[in-house]
């Protein structure tokens, strides 16, 4: 619900976005993405995922059309894999951004113009 509410949390996320320079990209780690492997999203345009149920329609209508960055995703996968094994991190081109990511980012960077990896 924080995605559509105004409260101390959403105000803090908004203040964070205003107080910091626009980042090159954002890497989100979400507890809502269950995989059998470590993976990072690697598509140009990740879709907004509504991975929840029983909430007001307003929440299901929200979209966070931030771009992805496949080249950066490859770099992240390589860096993480270097500490484990070269193929330890998969590049995922199907998932998108779940509400663990976009419900926060919609307040910090509402223009959705910062590339996001998850």
Please give the residue ranges for each predicted region:
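A short aromatic-anchored loop/beta-hairpin motif
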Residues: 1-79, 83-84
